[in-house]
Amino acid sequence: MSKMRNLVEEKFLEFYESWVIQLELYLHQLLIAHNNNTMSETELRHLISKLTTHHKAYYTAKWAAIREDVLAFFGSVWLNPLENACSWLTGWKPSMVFRMVDRLRKSRVVLVEAQVKKLEELRVKTKFDEQKIEREMERYQVAMADRKMVELARLGCHVGGESVMVVEAAVRGLSMGLEKMVKAADCVRLKTLKGILDILTPPQCVEFLAAAATFQVQLRRWGNRRHYVTHS
C-alpha cells in the first residue's frame, strides 16, 4: 500500500509529470535535428539552449521543494521503483554520462584529440567530486536508514513532549545536512552536463542530449510498465 502523499510531494509530482512530457517533446525535436543534416549551427544551438533551460527549470523547482521537504526526494513518489533504484543522491550519477559519450564514440561520434583530452580531464574531476560527496553522505547513512524515526516526527505522533522535541530536532538536523548533500550532488550534475556540452560541437551536443533524454524517457516507460504488470 502506498503511503499518503504530503503537499510537497503532490506539487512536485504534478510538476515532474509535466516536465517529462515536455522532455519527450524536446526529444522528438532532437531526433529530427539529428536525422536532418540541413539545420544550421544557429538552429542547433537554439535547440540545445532549450534543453539546458529545461533542465535548469527542473533544478530550480527541485531546490525550492527540498527546502520544504528534502526527505520526499529519497524514495520519490513521482518516480517508479526502477527509476528510484537507479538514482544516486536523488538524481542521475554524473559519471554515468561519460559512459554514454563512450557509447556514442563507438557508434558514430568522432572526437578530435583535444576533445578527448578535455573529456578525460572532466571525467577525473567529476569522479573526484562524486567520491567527496559520497564520503560526506556516509555520515548520514545511519540516520537515513531509520525512516521510522523520520515518519514519527513528520506524522506528529506524540510519545511525550520532551521526546518529541528531541526527535524533531534530530530530523531538522538530518534534513539540513541532506539538503546540503543533495544540492552539492546537483551542482556536480549541472557542472558535468555543462562541461560536456562545452566540449562537444553543436551536432555532437544534439546527439548526446538525444541519447540522454532517450535513456531517461525509456527508463521511465520500462519502470512504469514493470510496475503496472507487478500490481495488476
Curated annotation (Swiss-Prot):
Pfam families named in the record: DOG1
Domain annotation DOG1: ranges: 9-229
Domain of life per record: Eukaryota
GO MF entries: sequence-specific DNA binding
Disruption phenotype: No germination phenotype.
Organism: Arabidopsis thaliana
GO BP field: DNA-templated transcription
Record-given protein name: Protein DOG1-like 4
InterPro entries referenced in this protein's UniProt entry, alphabetically: Seed_Dev/Stress_Resp_Reg, TGA_domain
